Amino acid sequence: MPATLKNSSATLKLNTGASIPVLGFGTWRSVDNNGYHSVIAALKAGYRHIDAAAIYLNEEEVGRAIKDSGVPREEIFITTKLWGTEQRDPEAALNKSLKRLGLDYVDLYLMHWPVPLKTDRVTDGNVLCIPTLEDGTVDIDTKEWNFIKTWELMQELPKTGKTKAVGVSNFSINNIKELLESPNNKVVPATNQIEIHPLLPQDELIAFCKEKGIVVEAYSPFGSANAPLLKEQAIIDMAKKHGVEPAQLIISWSIQRGYVVLAKSVNPERIVSNFKIFTLPEDDFKTISNLSKVHGTKRVVDMKWGSFPIFQ
């Protein structure tokens, strides 16, 4: 019997007291007209959570789409992110993001990676890049700056009214512990946005974040750009069993695990389809949860940050 699909409407409560929709629309690699039209389509389909970032180089398109959608600003939860080259002055970076977005404030501002990047070798003035040394390795600031100093500045931003909450992204358990235990820490991150999917379930990190009152957000739920999870035979077979799309199955499984999931597409039909979810029976839920034990874990977004212990 086909599953009963319904539009996603659930929210989770942040440690600030604000609510965040559990199904968000991701905008990574959605540039130019694709970025604009996909956000328009998402808002039309019912999404009320848009996830952006300075490094995605599409904040202007995202902001224009939000304005043109006709959906009142206060009904949309909007996130953007601080890039590593701007960690020394997050307020200035946020001001630039707000200008590009055409907004007075965002609902959530994240430190995109816990890695401060040097700008010494940036010659064209464009700091929204990944600076590299002559040998091709990333030019990381390992001596004069660190994510603790960045967070000390970020935690003051909600007082300005330019963001309602601050959080982190791609933080490991050890990095979160270091942040929370730092002497000048006053604010627990509202969220930690990380890669999660059936082949990288992140059970330990999710449990740790929940214990600390940090809402987890999952990016790349289908395994990033080429969506390899949608080609997993076990996923395909189970989706057929329930009369749903593989993407709907994965999104529903993710939400059932109790965290925010960010779905991304530039295809209008898939954008609508991805917004419809259902409740998996317990045995099928466990089958998907155990896929990584059968096939092994696989991290898709495996950024190389030199010797920085990013996922340790």
Swiss-Prot record:
Disruption phenotype: Yeast in which the YPR1 gene has been deleted possess 50% lower 2-methylbutanal reductase activity than the wild-type strain. This suggests that the enzyme may contribute to 2-methylbutanal reduction in vivo. It holds the Pfam family Aldo_ket_red. Keywords: Cytoplasm, NADP, Oxidoreductase. GO terms for cellular component: cytoplasm; cytosol; nucleus. Gene3D superfamilies: NADP-dependent oxidoreductase domain. Substrate binds at residue 112. GO terms for molecular function: aldose reductase (NADPH) activity; carbonyl reductase (NADPH) activity; diacetyl reductase ((S)-acetoin forming) (NAD+) activity. It comes from the Eukaryota. The record marks 81 as: Lowers pKa of active site Tyr. It is found in: Cytoplasm. InterPro entries: AKR, AKR3A, Aldo/ket_reductase_CS, NADP_OxRdtase_dom, NADP_OxRdtase_dom_sf. Induction: Is expressed during aerobic growth on glucose, and its levels are rapidly up-regulated by osmotic and oxidative stress. Optimum pH is 5.4 with 4-nitrobenzaldehyde as substrate, but can function over a broad pH range. It catalyses: a primary alcohol + NADP(+) = an aldehyde + NADPH + H(+); 2-methylbutan-1-ol + NADP(+) = 2-methylbutanal + NADPH + H(+); hexan-1-ol + NADP(+) = hexanal + NADPH + H(+). NADP(+) binds at residues 220-274. GO terms for biological process: acetoin metabolic process; arabinose catabolic process; cellular response to oxidative stress; D-xylose catabolic process. PROSITE patterns: ALDOKETO_REDUCTASE_1, ALDOKETO_REDUCTASE_2, ALDOKETO_REDUCTASE_3. SUPFAM superfamilies: NAD(P)-linked oxidoreductase. The active site is at residue 56. Aldehyde reductase with broad substrate specificity, catalyzing the NADPH-dependent reduction of aldehydes into the corresponding alcohols. In vitro, displays high specific activity towards 2-methylbutanal (2-methylbutyraldehyde), as well as other aldehydes such as hexanal (a toxic lipid peroxidation product and phytoalexin), but exhibits extremely low activity as a glycerol dehydrogenase. Seems to contribute to 2-methylbutanal reduction in vivo, and may therefore play a role in isoleucine catabolism and fusel alcohol formation. Belongs to the aldo/keto reductase family. This is Aldehyde reductase YPR1.
